[in-house]
Amino acid sequence: APNDIASFSGQVTNLAFLLSSQCKGAVAFGDYFVAFNYYVVKEFGEIWYEKLNCISTSEHHIISRTIKDSIEKGMKQFIWGVNQPAGNRSYNSPFTNVSWYDKYYFKSLFEDFYYPDGSKPKWKQIDTLQRMFMELMRKIRLIKPITFPVTTMALVHNNKEYLDNDYKELCAEEWAKGGSFFCYNSDNPTSLASCCRVLNEMSDNTFSSTTGMTGVMTGSCNVITLNINRITQDYFRTVDTNYFGNSGILYQDITEEDMDGFKKYLIDILERVYKYHIAYKTMLYELEDKGMLAASNGGYIYIKKLYSTIGVIGYTEAAQFLGLEINNNKEYKEFLQL
């Protein structure tokens, strides 16, 4: 098991590659900051957040680092690690998700969670780590357009307003500064969503792996992305002979009959994707039942906890191909709702 920030960051990065190589889907660390905090406390004490500007290196180090620098170094190790291409994934990076929480989400999910030494995570610790990570991701993206981890902010509301006003303001400020993350709004803080996946019930939260992670399990076992631009152009250029080879198609000139044909063409593709997802997940269930999935054997994740995901890209380009203006107009919204 890891015993400091560096070894924890290295093992979590390796775990992302391990899990994604077995399922070819998206790995979600819904408890990254809770686990990360355990090793920060082990190195710098319970109130490390009050000592961020204190020097943590000795006179023997060429590079002088503060406690904040040392913590960010571990975060960078994880961020840069999961953005490396992997040979067993056709040289793609492992699709990695990380969740942020407001105070009420944190209390609901981790109020009764204990670390191996009997201590408990404190909100001030997690809050500080989340803000540091958020700022670090934004700064790194000014240098390099990194993809992962995809981050999702989970906020609790009462159907009228957000309960944690500080995190409501934090989200607005980060978006205004150019931060990029999803936001999941819920009136039920026992459920969790990451990236494009639907919510996952978190009330059964019992297992802790050797990485120090909690029992929060979420992710995707398979991701298939539909390129709407490619599908649209294929149909109107090749399938529907009324528009064969025509690169100047206008949305308003498409007949209702032809639009119905396009919808059927899209549905046929979706049905093939559904069948592939079902077949692939059935195979994973069979492997799991036979004890052939190391991730399940180790208790990291179970196939029933994983979603089969359909991604969508190319809507804007498809609309432009059909001569639509990309703004808040009736025809564009109509096309998006096909």
Regions found by a protein language model. Give the residues of each.
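Contiguous, well-ordered alpha-helical segments that form the cores/surfaces of helical PPI scaffolds
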Residues: 308-321
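Conserved catalytic cores of very large enzyme subunits
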Residues: 1-304, 325, 329-338
